[in-house]
């Protein structure tokens, strides 16, 4: 079977948005205080900060739950049963059922679906929160410290043994009661410092600080590599514009970390990438020398134009540090990941 995402049409989106606004106003106040995803005046940053507070209080083990293909596996009949408890209007129930039954594609033919929520639709996040509200209530009844952002749920306990016990019982609840599946390969009981939550992790020791998870750092670097790869005909202005757009957006989210030294090091790394990229772009010793002259590099330092060393090594050289200085890149619009956050 080939899965085709339930991508709504313009009219579908308009109607879903209208329905969502009405239902969200009614339902949102009833949702758990531990739920942060896709709710007014709530954010991923608030969820991460709450997780940090639990860890600081001595809950040094986390049950990191990953729900397997959550948006694909939501059972329609169960979901409609939950909606019917909150919505009396039969016409509205019929409309929501129609959105859910968008269908999947098999051998070129669309057949009705019995599982999943319409990904990309305005109504989908609200329906997902409704499904997982049952999980929130169960965790609250058991007295657990937990944080949920959409289908990302972390439960904090004081010991590994308690974590294993909770993992087993909650996984059983999710499977039997919610009719969803826990991805055992991606779920774990571990120290919070070993796991990623909404792109962040935490430092070890008595002073718990928010830091950027290794996978998030690697994704950032991979995107910078893609942007700064020298392509024929791509100007430094174009590269800078794309870099600035990406880096400002990234800083807006990950600037919430409490490890400024990481942001400073990343900014330095971006500049090195740019110096290496420009060195490659200049190609020949003659062009490199001319570029260094134009950048105001002094006579002795210009001699490295004929160096046979690699671009990444030369990116650290004094000549490129002077010619392609931090101030030079700033004048071209390159933002810092740390300054003016």
Q: What kind of region is each of these model predictions?
A:
Residues 1-341:
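Non-catalytic terminal/accessory segments
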